[in-house]
Amino acid sequence: MPTDMEHTGHYLHLAFLMTTVFSLSPGTKANYTRLWANSTSSWDSVIQNKTGRNQNENINTNPITPEVDYKGNSTNMPETSHIVALTSKSEQELYIPSVVSNSPSTVQSIENTSKSHGEIFKKDVCAENNNNMAMLICLIIIAVLFLICTFLFLSTVVLANKVSSLRRSKQVGKRQPRSNGDFLASGLWPAESDTWKRTKQLTGPNLVMQSTGVLTATRERKDEEGTEKLTNKQIG
């Protein structure tokens, strides 16, 4: 009986160790439970066969004495428990290195996948930031060019006004001040503007005024010439 208790205690200790190993490796727990179920079922069948054979042998040899049968069974039970303990030890020794060898590989694969995903995400973020920066730079360049063009256009208009005012100040006589539209029109169509002004001057009452002015000027010249001749005759 004490040997049976020792073997059962040893068996329970090994079972506790195996459960702790299972808890440490949840990824391979299902596979090992299948192996353990198969092994336990096979060993149970072996034990049942052995116990049945021993019982039959004991019954055939000593059918009258049940104590001998009990002793035989008691002597056979430690052997079976010892066999189960040895098999559990061998299975544990085979299983623990596989768990130890598989766990670092799984951890490394998880770390590699996480690193690869992180690197891909960083690359995507950097590419998006670069695209946004390029778009902003293009918009800034376009805005600067637009401002430069508007500044040049306004400066040309101002310079044109100054040049026209200088020309007007140099010209002799009084004329109507020309606007910016007139200056641009004369710059674009100078010949047409001159002909239009001439035709305007030679039509209507302007022509009459010009003709009367010319006639009066010729008469005054003739009168001056006549007076000069008369004075010359009187002196002579």
From Swiss-Prot:
<feature type="region of interest" description="Disordered">
    <location>
        <begin position="217"/>
        <end position="236"/>
    </location>
</feature>
<feature type="glycosylation site" description="N-linked (GlcNAc...) asparagine">
    <location>
        <position position="112"/>
    </location>
</feature>
<dbReference type="GO" id="GO:0005929">
    <property type="term" value="C:cilium"/>
</dbReference>
<keyword id="KW-0732">Signal</keyword>
<feature type="topological domain" description="Cytoplasmic">
    <location>
        <begin position="155"/>
        <end position="236"/>
    </location>
</feature>
<feature type="glycosylation site" description="N-linked (GlcNAc...) asparagine">
    <location>
        <position position="31"/>
    </location>
</feature>
<comment type="function">
    <text>May complex with itself or/and other proteins within the membrane, to function as part of a cell-surface receptor.</text>
</comment>
<dbReference type="GO" id="GO:0004888">
    <property type="term" value="F:transmembrane signaling receptor activity"/>
</dbReference>
<dbReference type="Pfam" id="PF05399">
    <property type="entry name" value="EVI2A"/>
</dbReference>
<feature type="compositionally biased region" description="Basic and acidic residues">
    <location>
        <begin position="218"/>
        <end position="236"/>
    </location>
</feature>
<keyword id="KW-0656">Proto-oncogene</keyword>
<keyword id="KW-0325">Glycoprotein</keyword>
<keyword id="KW-0597">Phosphoprotein</keyword>
<feature type="glycosylation site" description="N-linked (GlcNAc...) asparagine">
    <location>
        <position position="49"/>
    </location>
</feature>
<dbReference type="GO" id="GO:0005829">
    <property type="term" value="C:cytosol"/>
</dbReference>
<feature type="signal peptide">
    <location>
        <begin position="1"/>
        <end position="30"/>
    </location>
</feature>
<feature type="glycosylation site" description="N-linked (GlcNAc...) asparagine">
    <location>
        <position position="73"/>
    </location>
</feature>
<dbReference type="GO" id="GO:0005886">
    <property type="term" value="C:plasma membrane"/>
</dbReference>
<feature type="modified residue" description="Phosphoserine">
    <location>
        <position position="211"/>
    </location>
</feature>
<keyword id="KW-0812">Transmembrane</keyword>
<dbReference type="GO" id="GO:0005794">
    <property type="term" value="C:Golgi apparatus"/>
</dbReference>
<feature type="glycosylation site" description="N-linked (GlcNAc...) asparagine">
    <location>
        <position position="38"/>
    </location>
</feature>
<feature type="topological domain" description="Extracellular">
    <location>
        <begin position="31"/>
        <end position="133"/>
    </location>
</feature>
<comment type="similarity">
    <text>Belongs to the EVI2A family.</text>
</comment>
<keyword id="KW-0472">Membrane</keyword>
<dbReference type="InterPro" id="IPR008608">
    <property type="entry name" value="Ectropic_vir_integratn_site_2A"/>
</dbReference>
<feature type="transmembrane region" description="Helical">
    <location>
        <begin position="134"/>
        <end position="154"/>
    </location>
</feature>
<keyword id="KW-1133">Transmembrane helix</keyword>
<protein>
    <recommendedName>
        <fullName>Protein EVI2A</fullName>
    </recommendedName>
</protein>
<dbReference type="GO" id="GO:0043231">
    <property type="term" value="C:intracellular membrane-bounded organelle"/>
</dbReference>
